[in-house]
Amino acid sequence: MTRDHNSRRNHFFGRLCKGGLLLALAPLFMASCAGDGFDDGERFISDVSNSTLSSPDANNVTCTASADGKSQTITWKVVRGAGGYLFSFYDMANLDEPIVKDSLIDGCSVTVKREEDMNYRIELRTKGNSELNNQDATETTQVTVSTFTPTYATIPAGSDLNEWFAANPIPDTAVDEMLNYDLEGGAEYTLSDVLDFDAKRVTLRTNNKTNHAKIVYTTATSGITTTAQMNIKYLDFDCSGMTNATGVFAFSKSTTVAAANTIDASKYKWSGAYIPDPISIVNCNFDNVKGYFFWDNQVKTWADNVLVDNCVVRLAPEASIGGGVFWTNKAGQINNLTVNACTFYEDPDWAFDYKYFYQAGMAKAPDLYVDNTSYSAAATNSVNYTNSTFYHVTWNNGQWGNYNGMQSKTYSYWIMTDCIFYDCSTSGSVPRRFLHGRTNQPGAKFNNNTYMNADGTFQDPGNYDTSGTIIEEDPQFANPAQGDFTISGPTQVARKTGDPRWLP
């Protein structure tokens, strides 16, 4: 059964954006026109009087992002004789709930918060000036602004992605530059075979981050593979067609490897492909995941960073799986894995399970250097779980982690903070298996985690999580059988633990 997590996600996102923008605007209404070549006198003493004013010309409205991309300054040319401007600001995906509505700006610029991958609408209407007997403008100027990186191609709704990319091959320029492929918001697509991005840098995304396109995996060979930087954003996946022997995502089996993705054999022992730039899976929902979420595909590829952020993943294996949800034990490796603000779960009565959540068998970081006495301090590896919810995963005598090449290493970092685990890692506690049974790991950090068993008791953290911050309290999930993990446990709510989308 496919579950829709969008409404909950949108509600949460909307609150954050709206609050942030309103707070950002409050101290900025006093901006002046001086930066546009007009002094204060020109705003209020003008040769324009006894007139109905016009709103600012849309061609003279500019929007400039800050250096860090977190804010944007909107400016417009002064309308002589004006008494101010009514400013409104919208998320184009949610026009019924303005971010800012009819705020009076006494000036010609305003700075607001900027979110990545958004389509905004700016509205400006000139206010009259009673001292000059000038009347309000009757029309409103509208300007749209996009913070999406430029689109390379839009794939028509209803397409089979394998057929479309076969007819429209990714150009060789994508070896050196990221190309953005957009799917249409609310549309459905199919994936009937392996979609191999090979050594090309690709972003696959919906052009509306709050109205996801859906990709349906229709066959046992459906999946997305890569040997390069890859971004998957704002998409829903129905993985019904896949099997327990395949992965939603995997390293590519292609023999094509970009020159930038090879490793200097004189420096490194690693002889396979290397992906120095991140693989990111952001703001996506996954249903009916029957096999690995990410695996090495039995290919010797080293990914420096894999990030899964703001995702919901419903696992539905059709048989017991000896591998992991993240599985890199056959040839490849992930140097740094981060799972943030995510939910991974199986239904409460699901009959099959995974042996591991994350299993990695390869050597790590400095062990891969020919001369490992002179490696850079940056040559570290890490496993990071932050603000996430895990429910009924590795419940059948499973283990949270198993790593043969990185335990007891001074350059390994283990971060597990603000997470909720329910009925997970029943063969040894979550913190024990997370640290591969090694106590006193110098790079380990725990904080505000819950480790609850299915019978209502709590796991013994032993000498693994010694933070003193463990929350032994039922998080009181609203309705796990329907994929609703909203919490009402007082301590978890107070400390804002687990996946943030489930905070009340």
Regions found by a protein language model. Name each.
Residues 1-10, 22-64, 132, 140:
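Bacterial Sec-dependent N-terminal signal peptides
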Residues 228-239, 275-290, 303-319, 333-350, ...:
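Right-handed parallel beta-helix
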Residues 69-81:
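Conserved aromatic anchor
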Residues 158-162, 175-202, 209-218:
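N-terminal extracellular ligand-recognition/capping segment immediately after the signal peptide
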Residues 465-504:
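C-terminal accessory segments
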Residues 190-203, 214-273, 299:
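Extracellular beta-strand-rich solenoid/capping regions of secreted or surface-exposed proteins
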Residues 131-132, 192-193, 218-220, 240-249, ...:
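Short glycine/acidic-rich loop motifs that flank beta-strands on beta-rich extracellular proteins
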Residues 111-134:
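Beta-strand-rich modules
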